[in-house]
Amino acid sequence: MKKLLTFFILLITATVSAQDISRTQLLKDLEILSSDVYEGRKTGTPENRMAANYITGRFKDIGLSYYQDSFKHPFAFKSRNGENIQGTNLIGYIEGKSNRVIVISAHYDHVGITKSLIYNGADDNASGVAGLLALATYYKNHKPNNTLLFVAFDGEEMGLQGAYSFLRNPVLDGSRIELMVNLDMISHNDKKELYAVGSFKNPIIKKILKNADEKSGINILFGHDDPKLGRDDWTMQSDQGPFAQNNIPFVYFGVEDHRDYHKPTDEYQNINKDFFYGAATAILNSLNKLDNQLKKISRNTNPAFQRTLKEKMIMN
């Protein structure tokens, strides 16, 4: 009888685990956000604002809380050619058991239309936003140890503008932010490889994420964060960059560039659906580990990295 009871407990546990992320909803969010309706989600366009409305609608459905009476936090900046552009960051949160904060982010903008061709950005970065929504859904039903701030950044493709604006105009005390987890391009890889970038700066992250890819069907690799790598150092290549400049530890999940990167062929039908679901599962496993062991992660990052980062900031 005890063995039978144990079997049923394990069966129930396995079933719940399998339902942590809804594959159907994950793919639905990606497919919708990368459809022609949003015309590539370029910052400052009506279609970008339509995408923002979809995402904040999902925030509301999930039950996220918001700051300053809205999920939407507008900001203004000048483009590289001097044009005044309005962007909007989308921010919701789930209160944790502690005062510490983990920022979980994904940029929702892409590059729009060029020569009548729509660049829908399925992998870059409708996939990250869909993953963010899946994580928010999970943690709404599983209270985290730390407060989780879910941020869909705008203006990433125009120079990480949303991330810089967020740090200049924080919705909460910035000293509470102890970790940033960024999702950018997580649905397209033929080798079943997902990179977790950030352990060069904080080696403890690699230890915390050990075996986070178990039963996900994909492999988490570490790298692309050594300053000696030049362009292959991804630290400043997505929204984690401004956080790194502010000495905030980060983990950036993403894949290496692929044949459809920044091309009109970055479409829903060209992503790897099994890989995407596995990546989302592995990221959830990773975030659970990070949430449970956040106290181990310190802002005292690798001194060599900090020196190189300051040099890059001066050069820029």
Model-derived segments and spans:
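Bacterial Sec-dependent N-terminal signal peptides
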Residues: M1-I21
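Solvent-exposed loop/turn segments at secondary-structure junctions
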Residues: V37-G40, F59, S65-Y66, S79-G82, ...
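Alpha-helical metal-binding/catalytic segments enriched in His/Glu/Asp
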Residues: G92, I104-S105, D109-H110, T114-G159, ...
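His/Asp/Glu-rich mid-to-C-terminal helical/loop segments that flank catalytic regions of hydrolases
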Residues: G44, R259-N316
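A non-catalytic alpha/beta surface segment that caps or lines the substrate-entry region
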Residues: R41-I94
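N-terminal capping segment at the start of a domain
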Residues: I21-M50, I62, R259-D266
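Second-shell loop/turn segments in exported
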Residues: D36-P46, K78-N81, S116-N125, A152-F153, ...
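Metal-dependent peptidase/peptidase-like ectodomains
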Residues: N99, F153-Y252
